[in-house]
């Protein structure tokens, strides 16, 4: 029962956050380093979420909130928010590191239930960035039973000169 209440509380907080300009969402950036040179060449954008209770900020683990975003469909607007923040940051970083790349996690739900292509292309166009500056990290588990779909997806990425990698490969 406690687990049920916790999930409902988080879902409610997620709905409110999305409705209120993504208040409580943050994007953290994990550097990607070139091992030979020791220089930063990019970053992975990581979605984080904190809910507010009694005016106190309570961080919520991605292990808890990501499945709830997917379950409710809120992963689509939240993912769009992270994508736009990440591409904006990539634009800023390319002033200092000209070949800087940004990796963005894309949920299986985003791929099959939203127009993620339009979102990606619109975002990189808005900041006048080349497609190869963005790498979509697709969680392998969502595609395990979708081999024909996955091949179409790969072809679409290649046609748009977009990179993708399988995230959490081998974890099922």
Residues covered by each model-derived region:
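Sensor-regulatory modules in signal-transduction proteins
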Residues: 32-34, 51, 93, 111-113, ...
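Structural preference for long, well-ordered alpha-helical segments in enzyme cores
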Residues: 64, 68-69, 82-90, 119-120, ...
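Structural preference for beta-strand elements that scaffold enzyme active sites
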Residues: 26, 42-44, 99-103, 133-137, ...
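Active-site core of bacterial EAL-family cyclic-dinucleotide phosphodiesterase domains
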Residues: 2, 6-68, 105, 166
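Residues at alpha-helix caps and immediate loop-helix transition turns in enzyme cores, especially N-
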Residues: 6, 41, 61, 115-117, ...
């Amino acid at each position: 029962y406690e687990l049920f209440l916790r999930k409902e509380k988080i879902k409610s907080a997620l709905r409110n956050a999305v409705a209120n300009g993504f208040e409580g969402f943050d994007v953290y950036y994990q550097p990607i380093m070139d091992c030979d040179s020791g220089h930063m060449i990019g970053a992975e954008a990581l979605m984080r979420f904190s809910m507010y209770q009694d005016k106190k900020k309570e961080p919520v683990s991605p292990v808890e909130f990501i499945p709830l975003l997917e379950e409710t469909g809120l992963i689509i607007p939240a993912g769009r928010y992270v994508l736009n923040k990440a591409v904006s940051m990539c634009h800023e970083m390319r002033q200092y590191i000209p070949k800087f790349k940004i990796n963005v996690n894309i949920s299986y739900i985003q791929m099959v239930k939203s127009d993620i292509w339009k979102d990606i292309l619109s975002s990189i166009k808005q900041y006048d960035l080349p497609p190869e500056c963005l790498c979509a990290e697709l969680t392998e588990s969502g595609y395990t039973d979708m081999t024909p779909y996955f091949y179409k997806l790969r072809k679409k990425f290649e046609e748009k000169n977009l990179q993708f990698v399988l995230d959490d490969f081998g974890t099922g």
